[in-house]
Design a protein with these regions (language model features):
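Cofactor-binding loop segments of dinucleotide-utilizing enzymes, especially the Rossmann-like FAD-
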Residues: 12, 32, 114
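N-terminal beta1-alpha1 ligand-phosphate binding loop
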Residues: 2-25
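Anionic-ligand binding patches
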Residues: 2-8, 42-197
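Short loop/helix-cap segments at secondary-structure boundaries that form the rim of catalytic
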Residues: 18-22, 39-40, 61-62
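Short glycine-rich, Thr/Ser-proximal phosphate-binding strand/loop in the N-terminal lobe
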Residues: 24-41, 118-125
Length: 197
């Protein structure tokens, strides 16, 4: 039986860590040192894809024998990227702008094994339609959840689900930050099968 390569999640996101833990695979977490500044003219999807690959590549360069997962998510409101708000005031602005509208969350993932010359990337879109939210609902949600580290200020895995009218996606965990269906397929191709004994 071949030895399973070391698995590394190139992310400091607790949401991605918690999602990857669902696969019951041993893995380490390494913080990727990547500049996440958007480039001029870069689309939200392009930004998510570039950052996912950059995160995986930064860690794979340090750990070439490991299989590395990099991921990034960018919310897209009519072609404008919406990132993590970082503050209450910015979160209020984001949710007011998004209420009653459809927002696409682009969740990109790259799996890379430098020693094995393996690299695959995919971007999973999740379309979310927000309710026509009242200002008092926005305030209550933000004071309760404090989602200032989430793209678009929406934590659908908790109370944020009450903000929504609908979610459309082929990979339900993509909205939380890591598309596990696609990630499993890429891991199998890289030699790590979550279902292998």
């Amino acid at each position: 039986m071949p030895i399973r390569p070391r698995l590394i999640l190139a992310s400091t996101s607790r949401y991605r860590r918690e999602l990857l833990e669902r696969l019951r695979l041993p893995f380490d977490v390494v913080s990727p040192q990547v500049d996440e500044t958007p480039r001029s003219g870069e689309t939200p999807m392009g930004l998510a894809q570039r950052l996912a690959r950059a995160k995986a590549a930064a860690v794979a360069q340090q750990h070439p024998q490991a299989v590395v997962i990099g991921s990034d998510q960018v919310a897209d409101l009519d072609g404008t990227p919406i990132g993590k708000p970082g503050s209450h005031e910015r979160a209020v602005e984001q949710l007011r702008a998004m209420r009653g509208r459809a927002v696409v969350f682009h969740t990109a993932v790259t799996v890379m094994h430098a020693a094995g010359s393996f690299e695959r990337s995919e971007c999973v879109p999740v379309t979310v339609r927000l309710r026509e939210l009242r200002d008092d609902e926005i305030e209550h949600y933000l004071r309760t959840e404090r989602p200032y580290d989430c793209a678009g200020s929406a934590k659908a895995e908790t109370l944020g689900i009450a903000l929504l009218d609908a979610i459309e996606s082929d990979d339900p965990t993509a909205l939380v930050g890591l598309p596990l269906i696609r990630t499993c397929a890429m891991l199998r191709a890289a030699g790590i099968d979550p279902l292998a004994p």
